Amino acid sequence: MISAHCSNLHFLGSSESPTLASQVGEITGTHHHTRLIFVFLVETGFHHVGHAGLELLTSSDPPTLASRSAGITGMSHRARPHGISRGEQVTLGLPLELLECVSWPLCGSPLRRAQIVSTPPSPLAALRVPVGAEGWGGTEQ
């Protein structure tokens, strides 16, 4: 669970304008930021992500798909997003403020094996996270 003092984690809800969503995307790198939110919530046991406008993109997606978002209104915490498979590494953007309040390691999570691949002056710390036996579980329901 995310501590209360981690107030900078933000979801773009359906009530927010496309202009605001694109501004946030330009600042944080939308496909990195949203993928992090999905993985972080999955790995910390959330069962539902409501109207988060998440992008489920991988490094193999062509650039033309980089701006496509999938609006997710409900997902099991054991569900695996289409296009991300075991053994693949995904790059995630994590706000530096949030990085300070995340407990490492997260027990049973691939985030405990995350590698920081970029650091400030960017407002995000980019993490490369393996998706494997310890990520998204070995049993599908």
UniProtKB/Swiss-Prot annotation:
<protein>
    <recommendedName>
        <fullName>Putative uncharacterized protein FLJ38264</fullName>
    </recommendedName>
</protein>
